[in-house]
């Protein structure tokens, strides 16, 4: 009799454990109930940056009040846009702005890593200028960057005292990839490697224009040099490898606000961890 009872108990326990685990990997979505006076929607944006105009759009949250706003910073060249995340964050009551850097995907101007950082600063300025029409709560703007966008996120946070939070997903630490390169010829050979990206026709710049600054100004590209400037920021770094461990340790050692570094079993765009990623971001936004 005891054996007969124990077995179903074990089975039920395993079922409940599996069910609970499945629950943690799920997310419940429901359609937005429109505010008739100020419904959620999407608006194209044309954002000035330098002497160029950036193409972008805003997923506007529902309701007439000003909303906290998440800025999505894409990678190199920017195939993964994380718009699944954007839709859920918007349903959570946030605006989400996506834009293409200068010289990428049709935005005007010349592409460059430093320009990307400057573009983020200019997008934040655009948010301030248009906060009433776009219903942006400029006291609560958060950056989310993927790959090169993770590098851009950490660099831009250093220049934006009013932005307190950032998520750096699978950060491309550009300096680490090229710190041992001594000549421009060697640099361009590496940059042209298809496994490292190669020549993207969607970027309005030559490989020389894009990568030569890394050789000329390595200190700027070394994210560890800016760790002290992130002391008061709330930062999450997520990776699919541990290549950024030393960088994360450097930031954590100086951070006095909030810092979390995790390595997940996934690929570069976090293909099998979309729900877990979205849930972590929502929790972070609610902090």
Features from the language model and the residues they span:
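Conserved alpha/beta-hydrolase
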Residues: 89-108
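The serine-hydrolase catalytic nucleophile loop
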Residues: 75-88
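Alpha/beta-hydrolase fold nucleophile elbow
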Residues: 134-147
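Hydrolase active-site cap/lid region
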Residues: 25, 158-209
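N-terminal cap/lid segment of alpha/beta-hydrolase-fold proteins
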Residues: 23-64
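Alpha/beta-hydrolase active-site loop
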Residues: 112-134
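Short beta-strand element of the alpha/beta-hydrolase
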Residues: 66-75
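Serine-hydrolase catalytic core
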Residues: 207-280
């Amino acid at each position: 009799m005891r054996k007969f009872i124990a077995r179903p108990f074990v089975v039920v326990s395993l079922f409940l454990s599996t069910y609970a685990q499945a629950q943690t990997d799920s997310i419940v979505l429901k359609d937005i109930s429109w505010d008739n006076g100020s419904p959620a929607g999407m608006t194209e944006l044309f954002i000035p940056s330098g002497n160029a105009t950036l193409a972008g759009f805003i997923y506007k949250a529902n309701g007439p009040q000003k909303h906290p706003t998440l800025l999505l910073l894409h990678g190199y060249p920017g195939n993964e846009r994380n718009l699944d995340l954007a839709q859920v964050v918007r349903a959570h009551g946030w605006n989400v702005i996506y834009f293409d850097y200068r010289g990428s995907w049709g935005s005007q101007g010349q592409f460059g890593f430093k320009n990307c950082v400057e573009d983020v600063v200019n997008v934040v300025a655009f948010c301030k200028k248009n906060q009433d029409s776009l219903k942006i709560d400029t006291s609560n703007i958060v950056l989310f960057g993927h790959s090169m966008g993770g590098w851009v996120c950490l660099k831009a946070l250093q220049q934006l005292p009013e932005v307190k939070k950032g998520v750096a997903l699978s950060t491309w630490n550009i300096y680490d990839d090229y710190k041992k390169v001594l000549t421009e010829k060697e640099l361009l050979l590496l940059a042209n490697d298809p496994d490292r990206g190669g020549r993207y026709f969607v970027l309005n710049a030559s490989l020389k224009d894009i990568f030569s600054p890394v050789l000329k100004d390595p200190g700027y590209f070394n994210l560890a040099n800016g760790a002290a400037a992130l002391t008061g920021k709330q930062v999450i770094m997520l990776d699919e490898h541990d290549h950024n461990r030393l960088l994360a340790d450097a930031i954590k050692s100086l951070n006095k606000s909030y810092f979390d570094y995790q390595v997940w079993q996934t690929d570069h765009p976090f293909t099998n961890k979309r729900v877990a990623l979205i849930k972590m971001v929502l929790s972070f936004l609610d902090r």
